[in-house]
Amino acid sequence: MTAGAIALGLDFGSDSVRVLAVDCHNGAELDTEVVYYPRWQRGEFCNAAENRFRHHPLDYIEAMEQAIVTLVQRMPPQQRLQVIGIGVDSTGSTPAPIDEQGQVLALRPEFADNPNAMFVLWKDHTAIEEADAINRLCRSGEFPDYSRYIGGVYSSEWFWAKILHVTRQDAEVRQAAASWVELCDWVPALLSATTAPHQLKRGRCSVGHKTLWHPDWGGLPPKAFFAALDPLLVEHLPWPLFEDCHTADLPVGTLSAEWAARLGLPTTVVLSGGAFDCHMGAVGAGAQPYTLVKVIGTSTCDILIADRQRVDGRAIEGICGQVDGSVVPGMIGMEAGQSAFGDMYAWFSRLLSWPLHAAAKNQPELQPQLQKIEAGLLAALTDAWVENPSLDHLPVVLDWFNGRRTPYANQRLKGVIADLNLGTDAPTLFGGFIAATAFGARAIMECFEQQDIPVDNVLALGGIARKSPAIMQACADVMNRPLQIVASDQCCALGAAIFAAVAAGRFISVPEAQRQMACGIERTLQPDPQRVARYQQLYQRYQQWCQAAEPRYAPTSGSAN
């Protein structure tokens, strides 16, 4: 391996993009830069009440360019020449419509302010009805069950549901779209000038988990399936939309002359294939087979890799897909997750902050002090809970505030808070939130184990994992497993850099690169036996409430969700 080689990892999150420079020799994180998306920060093109969340492509382009240029300018000139590759991860499923040149439609003047011409963010749930239609058709018997390898339930968060929703809602976008592309596949194509649909290299991760693609039926389902879903879907889009997909260790191309000039990097820089953030995060964390990796942020994405022989063609039910090569080439990558984790705590903080906002409006001179109080709310609640962590009067909270991803995706579900009394105070209710997120984590673990997919180890990574030991300890107690906290906040970007190093030829395989570059374990939390026993009782109560509450959100004629 060439000494001094550097790989860059690009991590496109919900709020910002991060670029991380990594030493390929030892995995040292040399420098990082984070830039927030300006339009997203202003709340443009989104409507939370309608579950509509869109990203303008300029947010990605401008933030990415600013982040990379800022980081590269801090490098000595000689070091810039040592950058050998760029890897990309992103949220998903986050697709956008593109024209025949591969330009996202919102980059054209006539679509510049049209949310339907933008990237439909992973947590956009406007396509619930369309997801229901896909599931009904998969189970109709008219076709093979194309949901077999994605856990048996197609989600409103995924590729075809979102495309169908926009197709039905917006005739102009429907007629202008030559194809659709996931963000993680579009960025490497953009940087290598290969965005045209016939040039575009689709990633095994995005295609395998979100598009119903599988080798058992030769790729995508047939055109007849989508025509039966809605003839509008195949009226203008070419068919098949694509045929091949590629693992992320393979190069997409090299940096185009235009982007090399804009970023201050050589045209020899290799672009590796893209993948979803949590899949690359698992690689950055050094995950081995049968390690459940929980990437914890606003939501969670849980990743587990398994041997082909153990899976042996079985369909694992209730998860978000099993894809050969979606994480590590040659292994089956399995995805699960919780639709809300950090978002639940943020919601509770906003709820409690209403009087502060009202006071700041009436007394502007107090705004700095009130903002400081608001910023410290969650930490204060956590401290109060840790001082008196009583489980005897813990409220029931169901962690469905943004629907449920796993087990068995159902985005119609809503959060539930129950079992309150006049003695329930804010820290106790916050304790209920902590327990709920831990219970959701255990339900995912059990979903694997009940289908003979063992969970030998549990890793947690992300800001909450490192900064909220009380929440992580609750997870260890509820799951009754040691919980290893990964030593980096940047594992997703690190994983992207690992793939860049492999694609650039510095390693022959992802496992070899992991041995050199993956991060280590910061600490291990052990379950407390006394709390394990009490949480077991509370988990059973949680499951009873889940079983009782879920039927209340079943679709009915004329119902609103």
From Swiss-Prot:
UniProt-listed GO biological process terms: L-arabinose catabolic process to xylulose 5-phosphate
Keywords for this protein: Arabinose catabolism, ATP-binding, Carbohydrate metabolism, Kinase, Nucleotide-binding, Transferase
Catalytic function, reaction form: D-ribulose + ATP = D-ribulose 5-phosphate + ADP + H(+); L-ribulose + ATP = L-ribulose 5-phosphate + ADP + H(+)
SUPFAM superfamilies the record matches: Actin-like ATPase domain
A GO CC term assigned to this protein in UniProt: cytoplasm
Coiled coil ranges: none
UniProt KW Kinase keyword: yes
Primary enzyme class: transferase
N-terminal signal peptide: none
PANTHER family: FGGY CARBOHYDRATE KINASE DOMAIN-CONTAINING PROTEIN (PTHR43435:SF4), RIBULOKINASE (PTHR43435)
Family: Belongs to the ribulokinase family.
This protein's name: Ribulokinase
Lineage of source species: Bacteria, Pseudomonadati, Pseudomonadota, Gammaproteobacteria, Enterobacterales
Primary gene name: araB
